A protein has these predicted regions:
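Conserved glycine-rich cofactor-binding loop
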Residues: 12-16
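Conserved glycine-rich Rossmann-like NAD(P)H-binding loop of the short-chain dehydrogenase/reductase
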Residues: 28-44
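The beta1-alpha1 cofactor-binding region of Rossmann-like NAD(H)/NADP(H)-dependent oxidoreductases
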Residues: 56-70, 100
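Conserved mid-core segment of classical short-chain dehydrogenase/reductases
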Residues: 66, 89-104, 147-150
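Active-site helix of classical SDR
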Residues: 118, 154
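Residue(s) in the substrate-gating loop at a strand-loop-helix junction
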Residues: 138
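C-terminal helical subdomain
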Residues: 177-178, 189-235
Length: 247
């Protein structure tokens, strides 16, 4: 992936991993467009930096995605990198509720949103030099946390979708998967200070080191996520599920 001189669109750029990736890629000499639901959070990410731009987008709104894609291509015709980072995580008790609102919202934001935005931008990206799509999945794509079943399922689906996308766009668009471990962000209440989670700056430091490798790995995996990513291969899957469920 070309990590300098690119025009990069990052969804979920108002906080957490999206915010830090946007700032780091901007520091490397890229033009970065961040998208998210709240302009004030996006402006906090920019913080007066040059070559950073903000556009409001709710990835759960199909019509908004289509309009957004047309607008961003018109405003930034050099766009060559898409990072699908936006997402939500909700706890669900499958034995006590029959209201699927959280599940449906999670599927829309975490799975349909990235698929729709990728679909809306693929024709443009194929026409650009050094084009790349980065899909953010999760270590929970490979070993589920029992308390967040739909989140796990959407991230497993994003992993599979990314593999298929890589094959279909081979030679035209570079397809990369970023699978974080548990990181101290605002994804869930209290998570930004939760003991045992990877500090956000440490995660970003290690992640950017991997992005800067040439060639860029098809999967960006910090060391800490390896336990989950390779649990099934290494015969530790059941043990890993039990360990996550106990926490």
């Amino acid at each position: 992936m070309k990590t300098t001189g690119s025009t990069i669109l990052i969804t979920g750029g108002g906080s957490g991993i999206g915010r830090k990736l946007a700032q780091r890629f901007n520091e490397l000499g890229n033009t970065v467009i961040i998208a998210g639901r709240r302009m004030e959070r996006l402006e906090e990410t920019i913080g007066g930096r040059e070559r950073m731009h903000a556009i409001v987008l709710d990835v759960g709104d199909q019509e908004a995605i289509e309009s957004f894609a047309r607008g961003v291509i018109a405003a930034y015709p050099s766009l060559n990198v898409l990072i699908n980072n936006a997402g939500i995580m909700r706890r669900e008790n499958l034995t006590a509720t029959r209201d699927l609102y959280d599940a449906e919202q999670t599927i829309t934001a975490n799975l349909l949103g990235p698929i729709r935005l990728t679909n809306a931008l693929t024709d443009h990206l194929v026409s650009q030099p050094d084009a790349a799509i980065v899909n953010v999945s999760s270590g929970l794509a490979f070993v589920p946390l029992s308390g967040t079943p739909t989140y796990n399922a959407t991230k497993a689906a994003i992993h599979s979708y990314t593999v298929s996308l890589r094959e279909q766009l081979k030679g035209r668009v570079e397809i990369i998967e970023l699978a974080p471990p548990a990181v101290q962000t605002e994804l869930t209440p209290g998570q930004s200070t939760r003991e045992g989670y990877m500090p956000l700056e440490d995660f970003i430091d290690e992640t950017m080191t991997l992005f800067l490798q040439q060639p860029t790995p098809s999967e960006i995996l910090v060391e800490r996520v390896g336990f989950l990513r390779w649990a099934e291969r290494d015969g530790r899957f059941d043990q890993a599920v039990e360990m996550l469920s106990a926490n």
